[in-house]
Amino acid sequence: MTNIVTRFAPSPTGFLHIGGARTALFNYLFARHHKGKFLLRIEDTDAARSTEEYKISIIDSLKWLKINWDNDIFYQSANLQRHVNIALELVKSGKAYYCFTSPEEIDLQRQLAITQKQSFIFRSPWRNNIPSSLSLKNNNKAYVIRFKAPDYGTTIINDHVQGEVVFQNQQIDDMILVRSDGTPTYMLAVVVDDHDMGITHIIRGDDHLTNAAKQIALYDALGWAAPAMVHIPLIYGPDGTKLSKRHGAIGVDAYQKMGYLPEALCNYLLRLGWSYQDEEIISHERAIKLFDIDGLGGKSAARLDFDKMLYLNGYYIRSTDNSILAKLVIEILSKQYILSNESCNLIQKGMSGLKSRANLLTDLAENAKIYVLESQLTFINEALNIIQKTPSMLITEVIDIINNLQELNCESVKQALTEFAKTKKMKLGQLMDPIRALLTGNTKSPSIFEVIPILGKIHTIKRLAGIKAIKSNNQTLV
């Protein structure tokens, strides 16, 4: 196989869509698998809709996903004169022409076709009227440059996913190459840039299939070899309809804020339309080793499954090193608190127990608040009701037990509290409920036998002793 060069070419007119992220991932993995190049091109020729904010967001999202590109970022706007020059070459060779038909005139033709229930393919009266068009151009009449599309025969796309796709050339219109303001259109710019960048394979959504037919016709007119085409089915919502905001988060930045890990999101997107045997968990490194376009599925759209996405994220959280998770959690909590070194150390120590119960980083950070010494505990309704029903004297005895332990570790705490529950003729769970409520403000938490040694005697006793204040304030929620 020749040296592979792929590209991802987003327009900075919005945030990176989850479908765009999958497209970028597939292009990246295919290039890396074949030891080729993966390039990033920002298609910023739509000045009215392109913004710096969106550009930065797209770049940041790709970096977060660890989809790293080769070479410098290519900006389409930097190549405008090259695009226009190619259009002028096509005019010179008789494969494009100056068109003076106004948008209003075209709209009238379109409305007439609709009235007559006919499909509308614009064929300009200037298509073969070269002498008159040159005369009008020289008189500064407004014009566009249109491609002289073939008007007979077929254009065939041999697509790696869609198979052979045949377009009747009569259905390909004379697309605009250069607008009346002198700027090139997307359809021209993308062909010129892909050629100049040496792109060998284009992997993108199958909503670009019609564009592909027009682009291949343009490649033929220019005498250039077209890249291999790989049009993948789009991502649909769980209900089988086109993905939209009503399905929930669709931007990569939203998933990052929700607490997804990039490794989990990439793993999930990888399996949307590509598979390797029955493997579900595929690391970044293994994906590079395995990925090829032969593994891309059929023509049916992939559906988002939020439950599976959440499951995968939970798996990756539990598989991630505690120190890495602690750093991420501390970063989240630092937006709310000025954390002391002691709190950071407690979060690090407690991470094993915390991560076993979390599927999102945001949940993990919320659960880690039990180790944030700079914040007062927030008690849920059920925890307060348990505390109100618990005799203060029982907790006073627990405080004495904790205070008298020579060594504070999981085993010593478990043994001491188990023996105490027996002397009180209580089930161990009955004793753990109020202790958990006082130490964590919740009815669910990591093992209390783990929480107590991590908090240490001073902080454990301080929280347990708070029972009197809670009961005297009658902090019961109904």
Curated annotation (Swiss-Prot):
UniProt key word Cell inner membrane: no
Q: What is its EC number?
A: 6.1.1.17
The terms under GO molecular function for this entry are: ATP binding; glutamate-tRNA ligase activity; tRNA binding; zinc ion binding
Give residue numbers for sequence motif 'HIGH' region. Answer: 10-20
From the UniProt annotation, give the residues forming the signal peptide.
none
Q: Name one GO cellular component term.
A: cytosol
Q: Which residues cross the membrane?
A: none
| Residues at which ATP binds | K245
Subcellular location, record wording: Cytoplasm
| Broad EC category | ligase
Motif 'KMSKS' region residues?
242-246
Gene3D superfamilies per the UniProt record, alphabetical: 1.10.10.350, HUPs (3.40.50.620)
Q: How does it assemble?
A: Monomer.
Q: What does this protein do?
A: Catalyzes the attachment of glutamate to tRNA(Glu) in a two-step reaction: glutamate is first activated by ATP to form Glu-AMP and then transferred to the acceptor end of tRNA(Glu).
User: What is the name listed in the Swiss-Prot or TrEMBL entry for this protein?
Assistant: Glutamate--tRNA ligase 1
Species of origin reads: Orientia tsutsugamushi (strain Boryong) (Rickettsia tsutsugamushi)
Q: Which gene encodes it?
A: gltX1
